[in-house]
Amino acid sequence: MIQGISVGQQDHPAAGPAAWLAALGAAMAVAMALLMPGAAAAEGRLVAHLSSKAQADPPKGAEGLCRRYDWACARGSSARLTAEQIRMADKLNRRINASVRPVTDLAQYGREEHWALPTARGGDCEDIALLKKAELIRMGIAPDRLLLAEVLDRQRNNHAVLILRKDDGDYVLDNLTNRMLPWSQTPYTFLRMQDSSAPHRWKAVFAGGLFRG
């Protein structure tokens, strides 16, 4: 199991350069040990679906997520997505992005990280990702096609998004953009995501961004 993948601060300024470089170096060392021969070449071909490398701890603040929201860790049937459901997901992504005000966990809960649905005050990136997952499950999309993921953004801060697992690839629903993009077309370094076969577990991913050859 991989522990402590996070190397930045979620929705907060990045850690100091020395601390960040040390943490990233450790994460990359683990990643290189886990990657099979030829994985870098596969990454260069922009694999449609993100693949997991090993079991990982949940992100900071998400440890009790399944107890708070059983639907967040529910298994699904991998039922085929319809064109209408994909259109609904795109529309919902835009609507929630426009309606939820950005508020940090520190301001709401007095702690740096706490994964929860947005309140009347608003929410941060993981809160918004959770709300999108809840709404899309309610609309009939199978839970195992909706996977929470932790990434690094361009500034190397931790950030959370929702993955919509379509048949032709993994697409990202992100509170920072209204465009629903394939994961490989985002600027993000993907660190870990929910295991589609057992969403109460998290898997290391190590793809995109800093891991592109």
Give the label of every model feature segment.
Residues 18, 27, 59-61:
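Short hydrophobic "helix-edge" motifs at membrane interfaces and signal-peptide entry regions
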Residues 22-35:
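Bacterial N-terminal signal peptides
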Residues 2-4, 39-213:
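A structural boundary/capping signal
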Residues 1-17:
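N-terminal secretory signal peptides that target proteins for export/translocation
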